């Protein structure tokens, strides 16, 4: 089964083809993928402009599909099914991918299925060289979401904790903006932090000892006050690097301690981390160090699959389609969608 995956939930236009026949050859099933990022488009505004994102998806979907088919050396008539991101995300951006995918499926007379964006992220480490086995705890951490999920099987998701305000990735973006760094903030903060002292400034870790929920709004305020009150924060590169490193350390420390607590609470021994922030090297290294102390392992998606991409949608779509799930012909998107509301796959 060849499944075309379409990802248009925010500011990346991602297309990929998952081919189940490749699994028999010991491969991960990914036949090919293409990804277009709108970073340059939104950088001027310091963040994603929803209307511009939607219009750019419309411009890119057809040429990217042509590029993908050429890369995979197949025709569109060889596509057996289509999976598109149904939510959560920006409603206009979601609708562009959903309408394109559903229309293409209708024209090809193949099934189409809407996929939960965060389920795509959660399953993406299964495409990696060291895939986890169910059950596991998953940390889903991105610009729009931060949550801990106990995954007992595909569709069997229990939310253990989530952010009650800002997502970790959003906090990175806001801190970057305060430091005068360009969009997207996460990679630029991490780059600046490499030259800084992570212990130079003590920043709060809100809700660190209160269950498994997260809160990052207080940390954002603390960074704002630190920048305002610290001489040289606007022109001394070492001071700026120390602030970035201290901020990154505080966020990572919070995420890691919550992950350790979740593993101990559930008794599980595998942690899966996915989403854009999962590419952060300091987070990966700290998780590996701390999880080794409790006899647990950590699994990541390949770096190219940490950001939004079509491969994770194609794979999630394949899993649900081959289990017999079908969607109605109507097109509907869900900008706010709880992952625990997804149906479990029939065993």
Curated annotation (Swiss-Prot):
Residue ranges crossing the lipid bilayer per the database entry: none
Family matches, as HAMAP family: TsaD
Organism: Psychrobacter sp. (strain PRwf-1)
Positions with a binding annotation for substrate: 140-144, 173, 186, 280
EC number, UniProt record: 2.3.1.234
NCBIfam families noted in UniProt: gcp_kae1, T6A_TsaD_YgjD
An example Gene Ontology molecular-function term: N(6)-L-threonylcarbamoyladenine synthase activity
Primary localization: cytoplasm
PANTHER family membership: TRNA N6-ADENOSINE THREONYLCARBAMOYLTRANSFERASE, TRNA N6-ADENOSINE THREONYLCARBAMOYLTRANSFERASE, MITOCHONDRIAL
Protein name (Swiss-Prot/TrEMBL): tRNA N6-adenosine threonylcarbamoyltransferase
Compartmental location: Cytoplasm
Pfam families reported in the protein's UniProt record: TsaD
Family statement drawn from the similarity comment of this UniProt entry: Belongs to the KAE1 / TsaD family.
Keywords: Acyltransferase, Cytoplasm, Iron, Metal-binding, Transferase, tRNA processing
Requisite cofactors: Fe(2+)
Residues annotated to bind Fe cation: 117, 121, 308
Keyword Iron: yes
Lineage: Bacteria, Pseudomonadati, Pseudomonadota, Gammaproteobacteria, Moraxellales
Enzyme's top EC category: transferase
A GO CC term assigned to this protein in UniProt: cytoplasm
């Amino acid at each position: 089964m060849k499944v075309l995956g379409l990802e248009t939930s925010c500011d990346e236009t991602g297309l990929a083809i998952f081919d189940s026949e490749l699994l028999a050859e010991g491969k991960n099933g990914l036949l090919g993928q293409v990804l277009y990022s709108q970073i340059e488009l939104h950088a001027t505004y310091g963040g994603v402009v929803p209307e511009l994102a939607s219009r750019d998806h419309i411009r890119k979907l057809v040429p990217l599909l042509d590029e993908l088919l050429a890369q995979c050396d197949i025709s569109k008539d060889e596509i057996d099914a289509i999976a598109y991101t149904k939510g959560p995300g920006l409603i206009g951006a979601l609708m562009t991918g959903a309408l394109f995918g559903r229309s293409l499926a209708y024209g090809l007379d193949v099934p189409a299925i809407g996929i939960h964006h965060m389920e795509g992220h959660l399953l993406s480490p299964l495409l990696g060289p060291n895939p986890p086995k169910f059950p596991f705890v998953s940390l889903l951490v991105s610009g729009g979401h931060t949550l801990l999920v106990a995954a007992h099987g595909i569709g069997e998701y229990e939310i253990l904790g989530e952010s009650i305000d800002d997502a970790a990735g959003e906090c990175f973006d806001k801190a970057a903006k305060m430091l005068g760094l360009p969009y997207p903030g996460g990679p630029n903060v991490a780059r600046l932090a490499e030259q800084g002292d992570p212990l130079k400034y003590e920043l709060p870790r809100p809700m660190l000892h209160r269950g498994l929920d997260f809160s990052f709004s207080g940390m954002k305020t603390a960074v704002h006050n630190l920048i305002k009150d610290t001489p040289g924060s606007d022109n001394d590169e070492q001071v700026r690097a120390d602030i970035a490193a201290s901020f990154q350390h505080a966020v990572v420390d919070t995420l890691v301690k919550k992950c350790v607590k979740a593993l101990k609470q559930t008794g599980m021994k595998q942690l899966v981390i996915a989403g854009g922030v999962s590419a952060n090297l300091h987070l990966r290294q700290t998780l590996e160090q701390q999880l080794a102390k409790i006899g647990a392992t950590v699994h990541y998606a390949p770096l190219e699959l940490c950001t939004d991409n079509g491969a994770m949608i194609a794979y999630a779509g394949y899993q649900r389609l081959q289990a017999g799930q079908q969607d109605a012909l109507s097109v509907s998107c869900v900008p706010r969608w709880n992952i625990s509301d997804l149906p479990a796959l029939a065993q």
